[in-house]
């Protein structure tokens, strides 16, 4: 066996060693020797050629796993193996980019039509004149007609179909939803889960309790159910608490019921109220107390028992139209009611305070009469006393003042006033007078007989300001020596162009 002559032989040897053992023994390298003699057998030559061919085949398979390039070498038998290249091989070992992996399609194969984008030249941006649209969109045109503007069956929920057929369909849908609402309430389901019709609106009672305003057809269905089964069922009835109380009172023989009888009537006809009794019974009591249409009647001697009767006010009339208790026509309100006990007590106390307030005498000046005594109430002069404590304090102060006056002798202890008159006469101005012509003279220790300090004119005594300024402060006749800046003592002290030496003094 010859030694390898190149790197390719080394690679081939390694590949052969890594092959599994299950390969036939013919793949292994035969231990043959090359002899140049002519005595070799023809069979051995054929076997050698077969092995050579098999080795070349396996070498080509291994080249697929190696990098691109050209390899050359000698075989184990010493024969020169021709160099293999990517160009000569049947497999292309050249590197491929991303474009090579993309599949190629042709328009003729898949029948793809090229898309032509809209441009300003092919009509997308070519707008017609406004006059053409104005002519087309006149009255009666398809563009401006409401029937064509809002079409049913579209994505928008606002779309609907107009015309006779559309109106019939809408009416049928309303009737269907209304019937489904009745069925939902009859089966005990919540009304919120059923599609409510336009006629099925919520109604809230005045004193609490949720009710619903049903249509006439729905009300007839509810009434028929009560008449057929005797009760409404386990579902909540669509009546307010005021409606329930009114029905109970009107269905009774005496037109008056006690509170417990109202409870029992409601629970017998509507089994829904057999549960959670405390809550709705409180609402019933509030409705009876805070609505003027219900009147409380005391028990008569021939009807002993506990609790008063409740009946309807005689002037409330028929609050529910045509016997429909789903909604009242109007709320009944008594115009004038008797004042409550608190108001009556407050009024009596206020009247009692006004009676105990003492009267006061006020003197007024009048040209015809000297004095006039008038008695005024507490609302005109004295502020209203609001509490009993203030009344007691004022009474105590009056008693103390009376006792003090009695001690001083101003008031007789027997209770009659003393004869001492402390009143002063009232002065009345009857006319307007004038002052006297003579005036009193001021005497200051006899030195001055006149109230004036100077009897003569002050203008002649005061100094003249013009003469004072001219003669005293400013003398016009004297001359003041002037300062000669040219020939004086301070000549050439400032910088001058004629004396350059003075520049150093700056």
UniProtKB/Swiss-Prot annotation:
Tissue: Strongly expressed in the embryonic pharynx, particularly pharyngeal primordium precursor cells. Expression less strong in the embryonic gut. Expressed in adult intestine.
Coiled-coil boundaries: 38-66
Biased composition (Acidic residues): 1-10
Knocked-out gene: effects: Worms are unable to form the pharyngeal primordium with the pharyngeal precursor cells, ABaraapapaa and ABaraapppaa showing arrested development prior to terminal cell division. Some mutants exhibit malformed rectal tissues and fail to undergo proper embryonic elongation. RNAi-mediated knockdown at the L1 larval stage reduces survival.
Protein's UniProt name: Defective pharyngeal development protein 4
Lineage of source species: Eukaryota, Metazoa, Ecdysozoa, Nematoda, Chromadorea
Keyword Zinc attached: no
Region (Disordered): 1-88, 184-210, 332-366
């Amino acid at each position: 066996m010859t030694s390898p002559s190149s790197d390719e032989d080394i690679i081939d040897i390694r590949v052969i060693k890594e092959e599994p053992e299950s390969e036939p023994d013919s793949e292994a390298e035969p231990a043959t020797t090359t002899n140049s003699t002519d005595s070799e057998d023809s069979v051995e030559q054929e076997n050698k050629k077969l092995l050579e061919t098999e080795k070349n085949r396996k070498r080509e398979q291994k080249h697929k796993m190696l990098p691109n390039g050209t390899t050359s070498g000698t075989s184990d038998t010493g024969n020169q193996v021709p160099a293999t290249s990517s160009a000569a091989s049947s497999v292309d070992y050249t590197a491929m980019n991303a474009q090579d992996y993309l599949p190629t399609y042709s328009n003729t194969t898949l029948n793809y039509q090229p898309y032509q984008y809209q441009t300003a030249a092919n009509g997308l941006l070519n707008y017609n004149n406004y006059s053409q649209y104005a002519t087309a969109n006149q009255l009666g045109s398809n563009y401006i007609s409401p029937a064509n503007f809002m079409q049913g069956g579209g994505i928008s929920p606002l779309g609907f179909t107009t015309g006779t057929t559309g109106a019939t369909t809408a009416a049928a849908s309303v009737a269907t939803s209304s019937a489904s609402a009745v069925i939902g309430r009859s089966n005990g389901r919540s009304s919120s889960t059923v599609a409510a019709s336009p006629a099925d609106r919520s109604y809230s009672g005045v004193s609490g309790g949720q009710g619903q305003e049903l249509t006439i057809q729905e009300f007839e269905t509810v009434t028929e159910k009560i008449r057929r089964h005797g009760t409404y069922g386990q579902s909540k009835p669509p009546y307010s608490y005021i409606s329930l109380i009114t029905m109970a009172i009107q269905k009774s023989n005496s037109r008056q019921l006690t509170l417990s009888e109202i409870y029992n009537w409601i629970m017998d006809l509507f089994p829904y109220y057999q549960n959670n009794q405390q809550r709705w019974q409180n609402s019933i009591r509030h409705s009876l107390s805070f609505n003027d249409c219900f009147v409380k009647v005391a028990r008569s001697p021939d009807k002993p028992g506990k609790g008063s009767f409740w009946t309807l006010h005689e002037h409330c009339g028929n609050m529910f139209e045509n016997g429909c208790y789903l909604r009242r026509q109007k709320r009944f309100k008594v115009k004038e009611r008797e004042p409550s006990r608190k108001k009556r007590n407050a009024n009596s106390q206020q009247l009692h305070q006004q009676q105990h307030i003492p009267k006061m005498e006020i003197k007024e000046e009048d040209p015809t009469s000297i004095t006039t005594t008038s008695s005024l109430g507490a609302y005109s002069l004295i502020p209203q006393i609001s509490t009993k404590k203030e009344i007691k304090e004022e009474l105590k102060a009056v008693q103390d003042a009376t006792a003090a006056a009695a001690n001083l002798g101003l008031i007789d202890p027997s209770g009659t006033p003393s004869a001492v008159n402390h009143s002063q006469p009232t002065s009345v101005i009857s006319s307007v007078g004038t002052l006297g012509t003579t005036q009193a003279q001021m005497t200051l220790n006899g030195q001055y007989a006149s109230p004036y300090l100077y009897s003569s004119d002050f203008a002649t005594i005061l100094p003249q300001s013009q003469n004072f300024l001219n003669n005293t402060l400013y003398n016009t006749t004297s001359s003041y020596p002037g300062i000669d800046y040219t020939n004086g003592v301070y000549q050439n002290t400032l910088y001058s162009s004629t004396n350059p030496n003075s520049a150093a003094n700056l």
